[in-house]
């Protein structure tokens, strides 16, 4: 008798995606992050659902409702900090996942890569709107500063900002709609994840060598299921340690002050996972130029497949490209640090140098190095 998992209409979809899926035998732990992101998304949707049961999206009560969750709801503090720090884990996994794709040339699967970029934008939008909901000082001023950037769009900018705000400033209407979108977007993200996987399973996974692995495949279960479970345990241990020992480590103390439109915090900055883009935004003294650079800092990922000029897919056997890749990582760390610093000397010039280097490495140095490596390898 044929196994039910191979005949049942629903089970055979799950079977072909997670059980009998042929996977390359050489996948390293860098391939764990896709499944870790799935776990992060699940944790965020679950904790978010329970938080939404107690949260009120009204400017008068939003801050107090979060306080109520932490003080009066059973394990409300745990839900709140799991959700807040879960977002940080989500972005750590996201950036490592994208970094792995860049290093091993996974971007040559263009459909999967482009859906991944859409996913990145959707998750960033979700996180930004979620940060506004506690209605602390940094929530309010972060929302004001970031939404106000849209006013740099010629002709329609000012009207667009007022349309998003639902008035002439960030207020009750803004908070209500941000809550609505923050609730909705994770489900759109889930749908995009399914499309992402659909395209991935059309081509099969890449592997560290970048060489086609068709002759050497193994079933996903039990080999990679057990490997993924180890990843889950490590990540959930790290998240638990963060939540239970220092839940406010990655947050901003200003967000424990209720939002006050009459009092601007000395340093307005987003959560740590947006600081690199914020530093690029601030490094250009022109408003529209800064906004374009901000968008391009993420959208530049879309041109990476076009700029792949190497005859080899992966960087595994390309030491010069490896050096540039790790230089890019160092530049991103520098930008993250600069994004959290005040706009003064020497931070301004460091930020501008790092921003120029970021675009220079991706657009010029990496393609040029690829051509040089082709020449050195007589290709």
Curated annotation (Swiss-Prot):
<dbReference type="InterPro" id="IPR005797">
    <property type="entry name" value="Cyt_b/b6_N"/>
</dbReference>
<dbReference type="InterPro" id="IPR005798">
    <property type="entry name" value="Cyt_b/b6_C"/>
</dbReference>
<dbReference type="GO" id="GO:0045275">
    <property type="term" value="C:respiratory chain complex III"/>
</dbReference>
<dbReference type="Pfam" id="PF00032">
    <property type="entry name" value="Cytochrom_B_C"/>
</dbReference>
<feature type="binding site">
    <location>
        <position position="201"/>
    </location>
    <ligand>
        <name>a ubiquinone</name>
    </ligand>
</feature>
<dbReference type="InterPro" id="IPR027387">
    <property type="entry name" value="Cytb/b6-like_sf"/>
</dbReference>
<feature type="transmembrane region" description="Helical">
    <location>
        <begin position="347"/>
        <end position="367"/>
    </location>
</feature>
<feature type="transmembrane region" description="Helical">
    <location>
        <begin position="77"/>
        <end position="98"/>
    </location>
</feature>
<keyword id="KW-0813">Transport</keyword>
<feature type="binding site" description="axial binding residue">
    <location>
        <position position="196"/>
    </location>
    <ligand>
        <name>heme b b566</name>
    </ligand>
</feature>
<protein>
    <recommendedName>
        <fullName>Cytochrome b</fullName>
    </recommendedName>
</protein>
<comment type="similarity">
    <text>Belongs to the cytochrome b family.</text>
</comment>
<keyword id="KW-0679">Respiratory chain</keyword>
<keyword id="KW-0999">Mitochondrion inner membrane</keyword>
<keyword id="KW-0496">Mitochondrion</keyword>
<dbReference type="GO" id="GO:0006122">
    <property type="term" value="P:mitochondrial electron transport, ubiquinol to cytochrome c"/>
</dbReference>
<keyword id="KW-0479">Metal-binding</keyword>
<dbReference type="InterPro" id="IPR030689">
    <property type="entry name" value="Cytochrome_b"/>
</dbReference>
<keyword id="KW-0349">Heme</keyword>
<keyword id="KW-1133">Transmembrane helix</keyword>
<keyword id="KW-0812">Transmembrane</keyword>
<comment type="subunit">
    <text>The cytochrome bc1 complex contains 11 subunits: 3 respiratory subunits (MT-CYB, CYC1 and UQCRFS1), 2 core proteins (UQCRC1 and UQCRC2) and 6 low-molecular weight proteins (UQCRH/QCR6, UQCRB/QCR7, UQCRQ/QCR8, UQCR10/QCR9, UQCR11/QCR10 and a cleavage product of UQCRFS1). This cytochrome bc1 complex then forms a dimer.</text>
</comment>
<dbReference type="InterPro" id="IPR048260">
    <property type="entry name" value="Cytochrome_b_C_euk/bac"/>
</dbReference>
<feature type="transmembrane region" description="Helical">
    <location>
        <begin position="113"/>
        <end position="133"/>
    </location>
</feature>
<feature type="binding site" description="axial binding residue">
    <location>
        <position position="97"/>
    </location>
    <ligand>
        <name>heme b b566</name>
    </ligand>
</feature>
<keyword id="KW-0249">Electron transport</keyword>
<feature type="transmembrane region" description="Helical">
    <location>
        <begin position="320"/>
        <end position="340"/>
    </location>
</feature>
<dbReference type="Pfam" id="PF00033">
    <property type="entry name" value="Cytochrome_B"/>
</dbReference>
<dbReference type="GO" id="GO:0046872">
    <property type="term" value="F:metal ion binding"/>
</dbReference>
<feature type="binding site" description="axial binding residue">
    <location>
        <position position="182"/>
    </location>
    <ligand>
        <name>heme b b562</name>
    </ligand>
</feature>
<dbReference type="GO" id="GO:0005743">
    <property type="term" value="C:mitochondrial inner membrane"/>
</dbReference>
<keyword id="KW-0830">Ubiquinone</keyword>
<dbReference type="GO" id="GO:0008121">
    <property type="term" value="F:ubiquinol-cytochrome-c reductase activity"/>
</dbReference>
<feature type="transmembrane region" description="Helical">
    <location>
        <begin position="33"/>
        <end position="53"/>
    </location>
</feature>
<dbReference type="InterPro" id="IPR048259">
    <property type="entry name" value="Cytochrome_b_N_euk/bac"/>
</dbReference>
<dbReference type="InterPro" id="IPR036150">
    <property type="entry name" value="Cyt_b/b6_C_sf"/>
</dbReference>
<keyword id="KW-0472">Membrane</keyword>
<feature type="transmembrane region" description="Helical">
    <location>
        <begin position="178"/>
        <end position="198"/>
    </location>
</feature>
<dbReference type="InterPro" id="IPR016174">
    <property type="entry name" value="Di-haem_cyt_TM"/>
</dbReference>
<keyword id="KW-0408">Iron</keyword>
<feature type="transmembrane region" description="Helical">
    <location>
        <begin position="226"/>
        <end position="246"/>
    </location>
</feature>
<feature type="transmembrane region" description="Helical">
    <location>
        <begin position="288"/>
        <end position="308"/>
    </location>
</feature>
